[in-house]
Amino acid sequence: MTIAKMIDHTALKPDTTKEQILTLTKEAREYGFASVCVNPTWVKLSAEQLAGAESVVCTVIGFPLGANTPEVKAFEVKDAIQNGAKEVDMVINIGALKDKDNELVERDIRAVVDAAKGKALVKVIIETCLLTDEEKVRACEIAVKAGTDFVKTSTGFSTGGATAEDIALMRKTVGQNIGVKASGGVRTKEDVEKMIEAGATRIGASAGVAIVSGEKPAKPDNY
């Protein structure tokens, strides 16, 4: 598999414009990225632009704080699928995890998994920069139990992004049958190679073109 096919080509900034989305989808077609990852408001346009392409549309749920209710997250998923999303990246209830309310964390993830069943792949963002190693392991275990397809490191909107150490810990926890996505601060081909070596099977990056072309990113983003 080429590096491009492992990348979710990402534009999640709040000030993203239509022109930037059109560029993003054009680049996805050109380079063959796995997906474009966009905010829910851009799902429909992105799906229209990628009709017939190998790249699919990924969107974010409960993003970036994860502090919505399970019911709201489930509605977001259904709306996104209706608009053409084929993958959804949800943020867990981080406070509940820290409170050791494993039941709520699982119910929250399961609401998204159930809403997406048979229609969209689910990635669970655990926001590693806010967690202890014990919490990272517990978050991954709960996500697997709830039926996720992937676990993912970061939103790119908190205090830190992906590290090879976290990817290795997540891979060790979930085993070989669940995907692991590295996102947040992955900007170069070298960064990507480190993450893949540690166990990542998907990369979230706004610097996708720079990564596959070997050029320096014009303007580094957090994700």
From Swiss-Prot:
It catalyses: 2-deoxy-D-ribose 5-phosphate = D-glyceraldehyde 3-phosphate + acetaldehyde. HAMAP family: DeoC_type1. SMART domains: DeoC (SM01133). One of its GO terms (cellular component) is cytoplasm. Pathway: Carbohydrate degradation; 2-deoxy-D-ribose 1-phosphate degradation; D-glyceraldehyde 3-phosphate and acetaldehyde from 2-deoxy-alpha-D-ribose 1-phosphate: step 2/2. Its EC number is 4.1.2.4. InterPro entries: Aldolase_TIM (IPR013785), DeoC (IPR011343), DeoC/FbaB/LacD_aldolase (IPR002915), DeoC_typeI (IPR028581). This is Deoxyribose-phosphate aldolase. Pfam families: DeoC. The lineage of its organism: Bacteria, Bacillati, Bacillota, Bacilli, Bacillales. It comes from Listeria welshimeri serovar 6b (strain ATCC 35897 / DSM 20650 / CCUG 15529 / CIP 8149 / NCTC 11857 / SLCC 5334 / V8). GO terms for biological process: 2-deoxyribose 1-phosphate catabolic process; carbohydrate catabolic process; deoxyribonucleotide catabolic process. It is found in: Cytoplasm.
